[in-house]
Structure formats: structure tokens, C-alpha cells
Amino acid sequence: MSNSRTADMAGRFCDEDFGIHLICGVLSVVVTGTGYEPVDAARLSDVLADRFVSIRADHPLRVAVDGPRAASPIALARNLLEPLRARGRVAEIIDAETFWRDASLRYEWGRTDLEAFAYHWLDADALRREVLSPLGPGGSSRFLPALRDPATNRSVRAAPIPVPPNAIVLIAGELLLGRGLPFDYTVHLAVDSGARQRLTPPEWQWTLPAHDSYDRTVRPAELADIVVRYNDPRHPAMRIGQPDQISPDNQQSMR
């Protein structure tokens, strides 16, 4: 699978998405939006926890914490556990990397194929089947916490976890939006292209064009219910929509 192949985030990347034109001239929707307010970094988890517990649902709340590796969405999700539990909620985390496909499938076109990384590393069907559908309306409220150890590529053979209807389950990872997954609420950690380049570990720099394309075509900062501008985690800013009951199926679709 060649990185020069054209497709958009519905299945075709543009040629320039992986080349110098986009890297040098990407339009960063995450830094030009309006309605952002500074938030004390020490209070960010409390602000988000208050928001989540205000949402009314008759099943466990399925919250996506989406962001590039540079923003460490899994770290923010872990920081949310204590404040959510202090507010009387059962809270659990799923690291989206534990729902990656087997390495033989991820690396079928090479270890650094951008199209594969963007579309085929995450087993979205398994995430839907084992987590999101069971936690949704009419589901069993039992979910699989992990499918595979991403470091060893071995199945973790985890047992399903039962949770009460008022539980909050956080699914944290990269490139989660725009897949039609039935999240009830979504948070996007927005990091612009320059900051991503500075903050992404060297071994993951090859993935940066996929995030540039994600910003440009999926526009996660427009899809998410909450956007946290996270170029500097010490000085975040937040844009939040109005508190409301969740929609019957708050899905974002690839366009």
C-alpha cells in the first residue's frame, strides 16, 4: 500500500496529505476556532468530570478521549478516574491501543504505512462489538477491557467487566472520531501541527502526516463535544457545548 495513493478520511487520502505541501501548509482548525476559555491545568480533570456526570443517560456513558500521541489522551483519561469516582460514579478506562489489530495485519504494507495506520491499525469493529454496543442502549453493560497487548501482540484473554448503568467508560486514543463509532460524548485534545512535531517521540514522527490529514478532513475539533487546546498542557483552553441529554446515537461519520 503506497503512501502516495489518494484518499480522504472516508477511504482516500489526497496526494499532498503525506508530502511537503500539507506538512508546510496545513490549515489548523484547532487553533483558529472561537469560544475557547483558559482553564487551570490543575482543575482540568475536575472540570471534565463535572461535565460528564451532568450528562443524563440510561446506560453507561461511553466517552471518547481523542487526541494525538503528543497529547497523551490515555494520561488524561487516567487522571479522570479519581475525580469521577469521587463524584460517586464507577469509572473505567479502555486504551484504544489494546484494540489494535494483530501485527501481521497492521504491518501488511510495512511498519510505517500511513494509510494502514489511519484506517487499519484500530480494530473498530471489535471495539464496537466488545465495548460500545454492550454499553449502549439495550446492551448487557459488560465490556471487554482489552483485546491485545500492543507491546507483545498477544491476546490478553481478559474477562468482561460488568458496570452499573450510571458508570462512565473512557475510551482513549488516537484518530477515534469520524469512524461512525457510537460514543455518547467526545473530547478532542487539539494539538496543532507544529506542536505535534515538537512533542511526538522520534519513533512516532512518521505518523504526523496522518494527524495533519485527520485535522483537515475529519475535522475532530468540529465534531467533538469538548475541545481542549493542548499545545502546552500547562496552559490548556477549552471549548464546551451546552449541557444536554445525549442523543440516541451520537455517532460521527467519516466524510
Annotate each language-model stretch with its function.
Residues 165-169:
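Loop/turn-to-beta-strand initiation segments
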Residues 170-171, 187:
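Hydrophobic beta-strand scaffold positions of dinucleotide-using enzymes
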Residues 45-56:
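Pre-Walker A adenine-sensing motif
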Residues 82-92:
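Post-Walker A helix-loop "phosphate-sensing" segment adjacent to the P-loop in P-loop NTPases
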Residues 92-95, 100-152:
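Conserved nucleotide-sensing/catalytic segment adjacent to the nucleotide-binding pocket
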Residues 64-82:
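Glycine-rich phosphate-binding P-loop
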Residues 19-42, 176-255:
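Conserved NTP phosphate-binding and transfer environment spanning the P-loop NTPase/kinase superfamily
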Residues 1-5, 12:
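Low-acidity, Ser/Thr- and Arg-rich intrinsically disordered low-complexity segments
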